Design a protein with these regions (language model features):
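Non-catalytic connector elements of ABC transporters
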Residues: 36-39, 289, 299-409
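ABC ATPase nucleotide-binding domain
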Residues: 56, 77, 113, 396-398
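Helix-to-loop junction immediately C-terminal to a conserved catalytic motif
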Residues: 102
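ABC ATPase nucleotide-binding domains
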Residues: 124-130, 134, 138-284
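The feature captures the beta-strand-to-loop junction immediately N-terminal to the Walker
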Residues: 87-89
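Conserved coupling/switch loops of ABC nucleotide-binding domains, chiefly the family-specific signature
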Residues: 108-111, 161, 261, 293
Length: 409
């Protein structure tokens, strides 16, 4: 297979919205070439969305070796002021998309736009984008104030205005008294606040964050999650945030793009992503999820019947199954399952055996064997009247059909 022709794509300006547009014509074909008719239909839709998008990826592809794609036909648009998180496992393509937006990687095909303007050929330092990294990237030989002054000096901002902007940025992150210190004299959380202030000091419309809280302890990480989110909304800036931490994604974002194998598997607000996953990957990657394997025996509209592999039949909501006889993976969240349930006549009831009962402070976590699955989890609140189950104990489990989703096997 021939090598892909490089097309220079430097970073995006501030306030981006994400899209992805497909390959351009050239003498050589990309590793995968989209169907022309489908491409034209999608391109028409993308053009319409691009008119209102602040950040847009339009059919963007990325290959490092000219053979395989690490980002595949990515189409993503963001309105101004949105906080969007790119979430996925290692190698899913999320960080590559962020780097293309910043201008540190070039798109092999497709176009990236900021506020309606193509930025593929704009170098990173001219895109006007603020960036925050996990390693802070502070200059150790400079004071905090000097670190914040650097991006302002590059932009040739005068001394009096620089001082005003530095003070305002430090006050925003509650670090106004630390301007004279060096990074080595600060804690990890303080350094991250300074890194955030430096990204905001020149007032960008778009800020990119690459695993910014990954090196911090749990308590500090949770505190900064809320600070960053509140600050972004207060300032009205657009944020593209990359993480593999599901909790960060669900608590901080207006929308989450779940990546796998170079594609967005689902793009949705956090509650929709968790409550209504569109495929088995998203269901299992976001939060904790119980699965039962089976075969569709009936399907009509928004309801189907699934025969589990142990022979029992249950009702479910069909998501991406369409035919009788199709194999499916039933998805049920642990908190939607009750032990010895009182859910009414519509509830599904299955026999189960307790394998493990774990005390977790505010909740109990019970692992059971259900319909051939020995790792079926039930989460219950720690109440004064809570009965503590014992390994080997036989119990009945129940859940409502609306909480049961039939996904791709």
């Amino acid at each position: 297979m021939g090598h892909l022709p490089p097309i220079r794509a430097h970073g995006l300006p501030s306030g981006l919205r994400l899209w992805i547009v497909g390959p351009r014509e050239s003498g050589r074909k990309p590793p995968t070439r989209p169907d022309v008719r489908r491409h034209n239909r999608e391109r028409s839709l993308l053009d319409t969305e691009a008119d209102t998008a602040f950040v847009a990826f339009e059919r963007v592809q990325k290959s490092y070796d000219g053979e395989s794609l690490v980002v595949k036909d990515l189409n993503l648009s963001m309105p101004k002021g949105e906080f969007l998180t790119m979430l996925g496992p290692s190698g899913s393509g999320k960080t590559t998309c962020l780097m293309m937006l910043a201008g540190f990687e070039t798109a092999t095909y497709g176009e990236i736009k900021l506020d309606g303007n193509p930025i593929n050929n704009i170098p990173p330092h001219k895109r006007g984008i603020g960036m925050v990294f996990q390693n802070y990237a502070l200059f150790p030989h400079m004071t905090v104030a000097e670190n914040l002054a650097f991006p302002l000096e590059v932009r040739k901002i005068g001394k009096s205005e620089r001082e005003e902007k530095i003070k305002r940025a430090l006050d925003m992150v509650q670090m106004g008294a630390f301007g004279g210190r060096r990074p080595a004299q600060l804690s990890g959380g303080q350094q991250q606040r300074i890194a955030l202030a430096r990204a905001l000091v020149f007032e960008p419309e778009l800020v990119l964050m690459d695993e910014p809280l990954g090196a911090l302890d749990k308590q500090l990480r949770e505190s900064l999650q809320f600070e960053i989110t509140n600050l972004a909304h207060e300032l009205g800036i657009t944020v593209v945030y990359v993480t593999h931490d599901q909790t960060e994604a669900l608590t901080m974002s207006d929308r989450v793009a779940v990546f796998d194998d170079g594609r967005i598997q689902q793009l949705a607000p956090p509650d929709e992503l968790y409550e209504r996953p569109q495929n088995s990957f998203v269901a299992q990657f976001i939060g904790e999820n119980n699965t039962l394997e089976g075969t569709v025996t009936q399907i009509a509209g928004d309801a189907c019947v699934v025969r589990l592999d142990n022979g029992e039949e249950i009702d479910a909501t069909p998501v991406n199954v369409a035919e009788v006889g199709e194999r499916t993976l039933i998805s049920i969240r642990p908190e939607r399952v009750e032990v010895d349930p009182e859910l009414g006549p519509d509830a599904h009831v299955l026999k189960a055996e307790v394998k493990e009962f774990i005390y977790m402070g505010d909740t109990f976590r019970t692992r059971l064997s259900v319909a051939g699955n020995d790792d079926f989890i039930v989460k219950t609140r720690n109440r004064a009247d809570q009965v503590r189950l014992k390994p080997g104990q036989q119990v009945t489990l129940g859940w409502l059909p609306r909480d049961c989703r039939a996904l791709d096997a």
